[in-house]
Amino acid sequence: MNEKTAGHEHTGLGAELKVLLREPPLLISILAVFLLFAVFIIYPFAKILLVPTAADWMRAITGKEFIQVFGNTIFSSLIATATAIVFGFLFAYGINYTNMPCKRFFQVVALLPTMAPSVVTGLAFIMLFGRRGFITWQLLHLKVDLYGPFGLWVAQTIAFFPLAYITISGVLKSISPNLELAAQNLGARGWYLFRTVTLRLATPGLASAFLLVAINSLADFGNPMLVGGNYHVLATEAYTQVTGAWDLPMGATLSVFLVIPTLIVFFVQRYYLEKNSYVTVTGKPVAGLIRVTAGPMATGLLWAFCMLLCLAILMIIGVVILFAFTTAFGYDYTFTLDYFREGVLQSNVMAHSWVASMATAAITTVLGIALAFLTIRKKFPGRTVMDFLAMLPVSLPGTFIGLAMILAFNDGVLEMTGTLAIIILGMSLRQLPVGYRQAVAGLKQIEGSLEQASTNLGANSFTTFRKIVLPMLKNSLSVSFVYAFMRSMNTLSTVIFLVSPEWNLASINIMSLANQGFLPTGKCQVFLGNSFDCR
């Protein structure tokens, strides 16, 4: 039995190699992808692992400050992730499982935080609820200190709630009403139906949302820097070690430690979803079926929750706009355009952000569809490795990627430090997994027989890809491009080590202005940046 299996495997491998040899363009494409991954993923990540010495590891592990910072990072990430997922699920459930009014309004407002850097949430909360906040000090005359774990928790919850909502809502939408209606016909009602059917089928969405929010909160740099106060986390501490203490080995050590919890979350999520099946094989859905909806009381409570959350988001967006157009928000509300003039004088950072984001979106979209075509439609040795390397950056914090780029390309033939190229490279690595998975999802919806017919008519893989696959993936390509552009415009942690005086970005400039006290100009650039996102 084992000999037969080995023979089949040998035959399969031999057949795959013969196909590659018959199609030189396909073979060259696969080798080129592995070469790109070796140079721009494996080499930089190996480089950052080799920088710290044994003494650096011991210095970090045995230091009381490190233990405190590591604990702070895990704790703040867990509570922010938990509340963001709860908020995201309740919001998504209200949108998809109730007949409440204002759904369209809620959907639009929930996406607004994604159109600005996450640091904007922290800035807005300082302006509204800080020591001299508009609500706490100006209106209520209260002395409130938001700096610390509480303020960081609130800021990260609001900043990353949209990620949880989008992910969970997509899964809830895809759940066929057949099973819920069948359970209802068998006597399941209310909480029991929700717990045993709906919640279980939504588990993939919850797991994916947990992964996205946990990684983003672990790697969050702007909010801990502005709102954290003396509550230090690994992302900000690594930055401080590199730029403040000039201790590059310790910065690399802390960045590697930041990867550990994100990789654990990544692999646990994948293992859990692969171990359990959530597929519902029901054939074609019966026409006319209406989804089971929540009762009047639950609908009312969910509507109130969605409205309060949307009002909080609108307050954040509103204070950004008002601050940019008023002389001194909280003291002098005279209309002014002075800060926009200052923003225009610094318009080069907006242009840099736009150019880098456009290039990143184009690279990740094209490379993502090419990778998806190879891993989904072609059989070749190393296909699983290619898929793993394409998805690896999604589990890595932005500060780790940025520092790895600096260490790898600081000298030698591929020296890129201080250039636009290294910024685009770092952002492209960060966004590649999203473009890749979007293309994979699109390809899986296309019948493979269409490409087989093209091959039977004499077309090679490149011609089939160009004339058959690409035209049918227009929607996936456009979604991938827009998402990569928006996320790149707002990225912070990935590029914090990559920018230079010659090539600065708007997101970095906003945080720098806020740290220096030039909040109005920073708000103005947030406003201008959002204009690009909303185009």
Language-model features: where?
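Helix-loop-helix hairpin linking two adjacent transmembrane segments in secondary transporters
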Residues: T236-P261
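Alpha-helical transmembrane segments of integral membrane proteins
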Residues: F267-A304
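A short amphipathic helical element positioned immediately N-terminal to and/or at the very start
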Residues: G14-L20, A55-T62, F335-V344
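Glycine-rich helix-loop "coupling/hinge" segments at transmembrane-helix boundaries
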Residues: F221-A245, D332-Y333, L492-L519
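Short, Lys/Arg-rich, polar N-terminal cytosolic tail immediately upstream
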Residues: M1-R22
